[in-house]
Amino acid sequence: MKHIAVSGLKLEYRDFPATAEGRPTLLLLHEGLGCVTMWRHFPEKLAAATGCRLIVWSRAGYGGSEAYAEPRTPRYMHREAEEMLPALIAALGIARPLLIGHSDGGTIALIFAGAFPEAPLGVAVMAPHEFVEDVTLAGIRDARVVWKTTDMAQKLARCHHAQTERVFLDWNDTW
């Protein structure tokens, strides 16, 4: 796994080079408990199928990426979209990426596109947060019970290592 310095933090990422000329760079944005490794083989398969350069990274505090020193706020997705994502794109030297985001990553992609409409080539999102439904909040409350009563922490630790508890509680407490 590679690492890159972005806004004073070391972020892990994988970079799949383009295999065809003139293709955009795809940038994958993970969900609320995700990271590079949780995408499994999808990035590699998508890069091969499209011929595009594809970059997938773990946001600050996820996977093998360094965490923010300060606690998460309810505006964490705005911070990612308006500060960290532009800094990452600049650090990687990407011009007009095509953003592909799932859940939190989809919301971050949409916020980024709204804040910087000329920056992305396009945005594709899966299950972004446009509004919060009661059923979503109930599911997140249920996830806390699963966290406390099953091996969920051990399973997440395969990807988030020593940061696992913070990753889960930041996600769960924010909602």
What are these regions (language model features)?
Residues 50, 56-98:
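Active-site loop/oxyanion-hole signature of alpha/beta-hydrolase fold enzymes
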Residues 107-152:
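Flexible "cap/lid" loop of the alpha/beta hydrolase fold
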Residues 1-10:
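N-terminal cap/lid segment of alpha/beta-hydrolase-fold proteins
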Residues 9-68:
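Conserved HGGG/HGGXW glycine-rich cap/lid loop of the alpha/beta-hydrolase fold
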Residues 34, 61, 106, 130-131:
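Active-site micro-motifs of SAM-dependent methyltransferase domains
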Residues 43, 89, 112-113:
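A conserved amphipathic alpha-helix that caps or lines the catalytic cleft of carbohydrate-
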Residues 138-175:
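The alpha/beta-hydrolase serine catalytic core
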Residues 97, 101-106:
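Conserved alpha/beta-hydrolase "nucleophile elbow" surrounding the catalytic nucleophile
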